[in-house]
Amino acid sequence: MSELSTVARPYAKAAFDFALEQGQLDKWQEMLQFSAFVAENEQVAEYINSSLASGQISETFIKICGDQLDQYGQNFIRVMAENKRLAVLPMVFDTFVSLRAEHEAVKDVTIFSANELSQAQEDKIAKAMEKRLGQKVRLTNQIDNSLIAGVIIKYDDVVIDGSSRGQLNRLASALSL
């Protein structure tokens, strides 16, 4: 996995730098996301890993993507195909998103809850996390049916367990001492 990220990083960085320079971060993120989705398709993955000429592979890939790619996106795909790197497009997309979040000083925060959070609850958590971290946050809410109530908040290597399950586990540990 780390080898793939090593291969993907220069492509993601080049795409990010170009998109930033052109003021088209959203467009490039959409193009890379779509391209990554196409590259993950089982039949497409077999095709791009075949022994066909890179020009043929890139043109077919571009046709599949249709008008989702502008001329610069198409050139990007051609370069990746020429270097036999189309298979790492999903990792290129992930790295691009990370570079963008880093540039925009946005921290990705995942909230695990027993139920879907309301917009007001998400806003309250976002505000508290922004104050704690000193930067903007992008929240992702995931439902975890094993939680009784409360939430578990994760970012980077940090876990904040505010769930009832976590409280019960801590109480059980304290009682067993």
From Swiss-Prot:
<dbReference type="GO" id="GO:0005886">
    <property type="term" value="C:plasma membrane"/>
</dbReference>
<keyword id="KW-0066">ATP synthesis</keyword>
<keyword id="KW-0375">Hydrogen ion transport</keyword>
<dbReference type="InterPro" id="IPR000711">
    <property type="entry name" value="ATPase_OSCP/dsu"/>
</dbReference>
<dbReference type="GO" id="GO:0046933">
    <property type="term" value="F:proton-transporting ATP synthase activity, rotational mechanism"/>
</dbReference>
<comment type="function">
    <text>This protein is part of the stalk that links CF(0) to CF(1). It either transmits conformational changes from CF(0) to CF(1) or is implicated in proton conduction.</text>
</comment>
<keyword id="KW-0813">Transport</keyword>
<keyword id="KW-0472">Membrane</keyword>
<keyword id="KW-1003">Cell membrane</keyword>
<comment type="similarity">
    <text>Belongs to the ATPase delta chain family.</text>
</comment>
<keyword id="KW-0406">Ion transport</keyword>
<keyword id="KW-0139">CF(1)</keyword>
<comment type="function">
    <text>F(1)F(0) ATP synthase produces ATP from ADP in the presence of a proton or sodium gradient. F-type ATPases consist of two structural domains, F(1) containing the extramembraneous catalytic core and F(0) containing the membrane proton channel, linked together by a central stalk and a peripheral stalk. During catalysis, ATP synthesis in the catalytic domain of F(1) is coupled via a rotary mechanism of the central stalk subunits to proton translocation.</text>
</comment>
<dbReference type="InterPro" id="IPR026015">
    <property type="entry name" value="ATP_synth_OSCP/delta_N_sf"/>
</dbReference>
<protein>
    <recommendedName>
        <fullName>ATP synthase subunit delta</fullName>
    </recommendedName>
</protein>
<dbReference type="GO" id="GO:0045259">
    <property type="term" value="C:proton-transporting ATP synthase complex"/>
</dbReference>
<dbReference type="Pfam" id="PF00213">
    <property type="entry name" value="OSCP"/>
</dbReference>
<keyword id="KW-0997">Cell inner membrane</keyword>
<comment type="subunit">
    <text>F-type ATPases have 2 components, F(1) - the catalytic core - and F(0) - the membrane proton channel. F(1) has five subunits: alpha(3), beta(3), gamma(1), delta(1), epsilon(1). F(0) has three main subunits: a(1), b(2) and c(10-14). The alpha and beta chains form an alternating ring which encloses part of the gamma chain. F(1) is attached to F(0) by a central stalk formed by the gamma and epsilon chains, while a peripheral stalk is formed by the delta and b chains.</text>
</comment>
